[in-house]
Amino acid sequence: MAAKIIDGKTIAQQVKDEVAARVTQRLAEGKRAPGLAVVLVGDNPASQIYVTSKRKVCEEVGFISRSYDLPITTTESELLALIDQLNADQAIDGILVQLPLPEGIDNTKVIERIAPDKDVDGFHPYNVGRLCQRAPLLRACTPRGIITLLERYNIDTFGLNAVVVGASNIVGRPMSLELLLAGCTTTVTHRFTKNLRHHIENADLLVVAVGKPGFIPGEWIKPGAIVLDVGINRLESGKVVGDIEFETAQERASYISPVPGGVGPMTVATLIQNTLQACEEYHDHAE
């Protein structure tokens, strides 16, 4: 029996509609619209696409969106000075610096310079630490978006064996913390993992984020598993595929997220949720 498709596009639209309704309500109450600053350094084509989509969604939900497109020659100290300025700006609730940054700029130093209550990407060590201590504030967008998908599909995660393939700071590590919080027994696999197939065949819930097309054979999927594919890979043919062999996996899983249209749309939707949360929970009282 074919798996149910986890429709990230529809759920992301629901989230955006909820945020837009709340923004309309805020304005009716005489409050300001949330503000998001999006900083792009250099001219990486993929980064430009991501940034454009983020700005577009900001406009859709009624946020104030401020763009800072800096030349590739921007120095680290110039970028840090801009972040300091945005940290102090009361009209800005969220600061997003598009990664990766050009050579010569330290990603970690830049992330740590953003005020934790404006870190809407959820990458600051303070926010990761809060998640680790089971008291999350602003949460990494892709992992939190996946949890939202599971919640909206009423999937009970308590007691499931969850396996995360990939241990990046952006997805894999925070995803493992989110799944622990959701009651899973969680395993994180990475490039040093031995017998990856064994782990995947025992996964009730599988999240794959490695950026390699078709990396996980569909036949490895445990029958009835819940499968979330974070990979977005463009083949030479132009086709966009995930990290999992979709067709075979779909025949074995109970739920599966497609690529495109699965996890991807949730990342930007969660960014918008985080910005609204930062505005309402941390910054409203300062007005």
From Swiss-Prot:
PROSITE patterns the record matches: THF_DHG_CYH_1, THF_DHG_CYH_2
Protein name: Bifunctional protein FolD
Binding of NADP(+), residues: G166, A167, S168, I232
Pathway assigned to this chain's UniProt record: One-carbon metabolism; tetrahydrofolate interconversion
Enzyme Commission number(s): 1.5.1.5, 3.5.4.9
GO terms, molecular function: methenyltetrahydrofolate cyclohydrolase activity; methylenetetrahydrofolate dehydrogenase (NADP+) activity
Family: Belongs to the tetrahydrofolate dehydrogenase/cyclohydrolase family.
Catalytic activity: (6R)-5,10-methylene-5,6,7,8-tetrahydrofolate + NADP(+) = (6R)-5,10-methenyltetrahydrofolate + NADPH; (6R)-5,10-methenyltetrahydrofolate + H2O = (6R)-10-formyltetrahydrofolate + H(+)
